[in-house]
From Swiss-Prot:
The chain crosses the membrane at residues 14-34, 44-64, 84-104, 123-143, 153-173, 187-207, 224-244, 267-287, 324-344, 346-366, 375-395, 400-420. PANTHER family: AMINO ACID TRANSPORTER-RELATED (PTHR42770), INNER MEMBRANE TRANSPORT PROTEIN YBAT (PTHR42770:SF11). The keyword Acyltransferase does not apply. Keywords: Cell membrane, Membrane, Transmembrane, Transmembrane helix. Its main location: membrane. Gene3D superfamilies: Amino acid/polyamine transporter I. This is Uncharacterized protein MJ0609. Disulfide bonds: none annotated. GO terms for molecular function: transmembrane transporter activity. It comes from Methanocaldococcus jannaschii (strain ATCC 43067 / DSM 2661 / JAL-1 / JCM 10045 / NBRC 100440) (Methanococcus jannaschii).
Length: 435
């Protein structure tokens, strides 16, 4: 059998999702979470994980019946048909990858500059962010071999590094540091942080985007989604307990750009700082490469043409040559315009809107795909509530980010209305795999 026809096993699919999730947040926005949630950070990860499991319920039911690399857009298209909303959400899906690139760029700069003892200023941060995106854009332009096969080993390295961090940290933990803070302000901070940290689990969606290439998708897609979320939740909570249990929360907040590397110093010394920094750069780089090379490729095709071939190979580059450049350039723009918390909040908001429509699609198709209506309704209410909390938090803390979120949604909707009218594009049923 040729390699290109080889299906992903259950654990290869799990490793792919775990790799995206861990690369997206535990290194990049850990400091942001410490700033907002304080010592309630472990509970924040648990809360965010529960949100993700509620969304995953709809993903598993839909993904088992609707097999497509178009992922959530295929679900939404099946439920509400081809219209402006479906088109706008396809562009929003692409934008989620664009903003994720910005998140990775900011995370990379946060660990890279302290590692090389470079001054942390606006200029150096901007140059690093532009440089890392440009590097992976060039890498993908010239092509990349066996990215998928390497992902399993990349994830293994990340988990080993974080496993060492958790094990060593738990041995030297200060129990008083990890006692939850039940003051009203601390509890509200935990809830607000959980809304932002929702993005920590966003990677599970990559499983449905690759469902055509997974062995026995009707059985393995649901399993892979739930297993990957639970693994990542366990890792996140362990890392959070080890970090806040060894470093006073004030010091952790002060080191927000590379919080995990600084948190490793008390129990692993300078070697720990070096190891975590290198692990972070390795992890963020692999996540950025996967996002540019894989996810954004599929998402851009959907946003531009509204269709995918039945077997959209990961090795097929952007169907339109401008896709790579536009995706990367917009990623840099978001990185330069917003701080880490801003980028994280916009990313979470974008994903939550897509998730809301996925849950709505599940409700519409429930007789066809199965599931319990009360769970679907409860999931929709919870995710909607978390989305509104995120908007409220940004309204009271950072109006620029709030307006950035609103502008993203309005801009996407206006673009779709104009684009659809000019090009007459429609969504094709090619996004579904005929069984």
């Amino acid at each position: 059998m040729e390699l290109k026809n080889k299906k992903l096993s259950l654990w290869e699919a799990v490793s792919m999702a775990v790799g995206v999730m861990i690369g997206a947040s535990i290194f990049s926005i850990f400091g942001v979470g410490a700033k907002i949630a304080g010592r309630n950070l472990p509970e924040t990860f648990i809360l965010s994980g529960i949100y993700a499991l509620l969304v995953a319920y709809s993903y598993t039911k839909l993904g088992a019946k609707i097999v497509s690399n178009a992922g959530p857009i295929a679900f939404i298209h099946k439920a509400i048909g081809d219209n402006i909303i479906t088109g706008a959400l396809s562009i929003l899906l692409w934008m989620s990858y664009v903003i994720s690139i910005a998140l990775f760029a900011k995370g990379f700069a946060g660990y890279f500059l302290p590692l090389i003892n470079a001054p942390i200023n606006t200029f150096n941060i901007a140059i690093t962010e532009i440089g890392i995106v440009a590097f992976f854009t060039a890498l993908n332009f010239f092509g990349s071999k066996a990215v998928g096969r390497a992902e399993f080993f990349i994830v293994l390295v990340k988990l080993l590094i974080l496993g060492l961090f958790i094990f060593a940290g738990l041995i030297t933990i200060h129990p008083s540091y990890v006692i939850p803070d039940l003051a009203p302000s601390a509890v509200s901070g935990m809830i607000f942080a959980s809304a932002i940290f929702f993005l920590s689990y966003m990677g599970f969606g990559v499983i449905t985007n690759a469902s055509e290439h997974i062995e026995n998708p009707k059985k393995n897609v649901p399993r892979a989604i739930f297993i990957s979320i639970l693994i990542v939740m366990f890792v996140y909570v362990g890392v959070a307990i080890s970090a806040i249990g060894n470093l006073p929360i004030d010091e952790l907040i002060k080191a927000s750009e590379n919080a995990l590397a600084v948190a490793a110093k008390p129990f692993l010394g300078n070697l720990g700082f070096l190891l975590i920094s290198i692990g972070a750069l390795f992890s963020i780089s692999s996540a950025m490469n996967a996002t540019i090379y894989g996810g954004a490729n599929v998402a851009y095709s959907l946003a531009k043409d509204g269709e995918l071939p039945e077997f959209f190979e990961r090795k097929v580059w952007f169907k339109s040559t401008e896709g790579l450049y536009i995706t990367s350039a917009l990623g840099v723009l978001f990185a330069l315009l917003f701080n880490m918390e801003g980028v994280a909040s916009i990313t979470s908001a974008v994903f939550m809107v897509i998730y809301l429509f996925v849950i709505l699609s599940h409700y519409i198709l429930i007789d066809e795909v199965g599931g319990r209506k009360e769970i679907v309704i409860f999931s929709f209410i919870v995710v909607l509530g978390v989305f509104l909390l995120l908007l409220y938090y940004q309204w009271i803390t950072n109006r620029f980010v709030f307006y950035g979120i609103i502008a993203t949604f309005i801009g996407v909707l206006i673009f779709e209305i104009i684009y659809r009218k000019v090009t007459k594009r429609t969504f094709s049923n090619n996004m579904y795999v005929k069984s």
